[in-house]
Amino acid sequence: MLSRLEVVTELRRVIARLERTGSPAAPVRPPVDFERTPSGNYLVRARAPAPTLRPGGLAAALGGRVAGLERVCVLDTETTGLAGGTGTIAFLVGLARVGPDGVAIEQHVCASPAREAEMLGDVLAAVAGSTLLVTFNVRSFDLPLLRTRLVLARRSAAALDAVPHLDVLGTARRLWARPGADCRLVSLEARVLGRPRQDDTPGSEAPAAYAAYLRSGDPRQLAAMVRHNREDLLGTLALAARALHVLDSPFAEAESIGELSGAAALWSATRPRSRRGSSASRAASPR
């Protein structure tokens, strides 16, 4: 057992070493490069590795509907508020398109409310031709908001509505809902993927960030929200990939009884109702 003097000496040695080396440096973040678009808005581009997407589980994730994985597009928005209505706009629409060379990320930033129609046109052009639109909890707010803004801008939402849509939240609740654990995107990233976010700016700060940008005219005021949006895009894509792995091969990929039973429930929902009903009747009838 160390004496008191030895403990003090060791503590002084550790303190001296820390003073020499300094505290761990914060991770260096690359600057966000805002490009001006022909429409007068801003575009931020980035690339990331693409996860493997297994088509075998897609039918279960889509409730039996048909779609392809040839041109997957992940969509996420940042808005000026959560109330909806005609006063709320999506000032940042992020798209992550999966291709053979990885994930191409395009984040469309509205330079001013007066240029919203042009930005929405750029988004529609980028989404057109996709075989699957992937989102997280967007069905109930973001997509209706985009449709409303398109109507107000006198533009058609047909290109957006024509793409089959997978909202990962519904699948995530089946596979990963647990008592006492929420199904927010950041929570699932940490709990399911083992990837807790570091130094992330919460989406709730989006309205204030856009207001600050409009006052200053400096798009760098939105850099933190652009990074947050990019994390949302990549997190949604990673969760979709994980879900498709589990649904494609439940017995090989499921890591818990909850995942296995959730996969069974999702696959069961793809069966025609008449077949499920007749099977239940046969099971209940006396032999």
Please identify what each model-predicted range represents.
Residues 257-270, 287:
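Amphipathic alpha-helical repeat scaffolds of TPR domains
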Residues 103-192:
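Conserved DEDDh/DEDDy metal-dependent 3′-5′ exonuclease domain
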Residues 274-280:
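Alpha-helical repeat scaffolds
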Residues 180, 185-256:
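Acidic, Mg2+-coordinating catalytic module of metal-dependent nucleases/exonucleases
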Residues 61-132:
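Conserved RNase H-like, two-metal-ion catalytic cores of nucleic-acid enzymes
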Residues 76-78, 142, 167, 232:
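Acidic active-site catalytic centers that drive phospho-/nucleotidyl reactions
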Residues 1-69:
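N-terminal accessory regions of nucleic-acid-interacting proteins
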Residues 280, 284-287:
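Repeat-based scaffolding regions
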